[in-house]
Amino acid sequence: MITIYSEKHRLRNAKTELFGGQLVSPFENPSRADIVLERVQSENLGDVIAPREFGMEPVLALHDAGFVEFLRMAWDEWSKTGYEGEAIPTCWPARRMSQRIPNFIEGKVGYYSLSSETSINKGTWEAAVASKDVVLAGAELLLSGNENGVFSLCRPPGHHAAFDMFGGYCFLNNAAIAAQWFRDNGIDRVSILDVDFHHGNGTQDIFYEREDVLYLSLHGDPRDAFPHFSGYPEETGQNAGEGATFNWPMPPGTQFKKWCDCLKESLAKIDQFGAGVIVVSLGVDTFEKDPISFFKLKSEDFLSIGKLIAELQRPTLFVMEGGYDINELGINVVNVLQAFDG
């Protein structure tokens, strides 16, 4: 399996995350991609190639233009104020407040953000653009017809990024951008299977009223897990998209058997949908030792995940999302990919 990777991910090297009432070193950091890449290479998974540049048209096909411009200029505007730290959201347009976009950068950061754990540093925009190129290079390669599966080692991740909102370590929605690219290049039906521990609120938001992209997510119950306000089973799509969104929230302590039963249900729905391509939002923070999650999957379980997805015999793009146990992160990711490859 070919892996797409860009060194530009290192530009996203934030020093600040608000977690448990404290400012901590971010869980989402450059070492994550390094660890996964090292495992890909040590296991001889396949060639590792750099992406070409795809421009901004695929981004603007899904994301609000004002939001994209905000991300592009956020660090410059923030640093010009004289602030010495990273841009952290502190004020939001809460219930019954105006939804106007402020002029001052502090207000803009709040307006366009989901949550306060994700700061913006100097290289965030450049890294997010490169991550988008990584996923599109993977999509392009998969559509060439020479590969059954491709791995886009995206960093920063993307599935929490909505139409006009960043957060959850995400800025541009890589999986959604790839899905739209497939649609624009002749694939009538695309399925996005999100196996990250956290619900992909951003991906759901982007496709919630569409019938041509099926979104399925297996995740921690939002009553107990981030992002808390998205991912309930009654969220099934709206208007033309009614019935094209499926959520399987699961409680703390969920073991692989329960999780796998939900995976099998989701794969059956993908098969019934008749997807021409599957995009897998590959988060491995379902692992039992993950520091910010509460499922109990073991490393060997990720082999089963790859095998089950492969049984659908559909072209599949794996897109890196979460996973924060650095000791076994690479093992868990590559287990999925190797098992899929057979």
PLM regions with names:
Residues M1-L193, H198-G342:
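HDAC/HDAC-like amidohydrolase catalytic core signature
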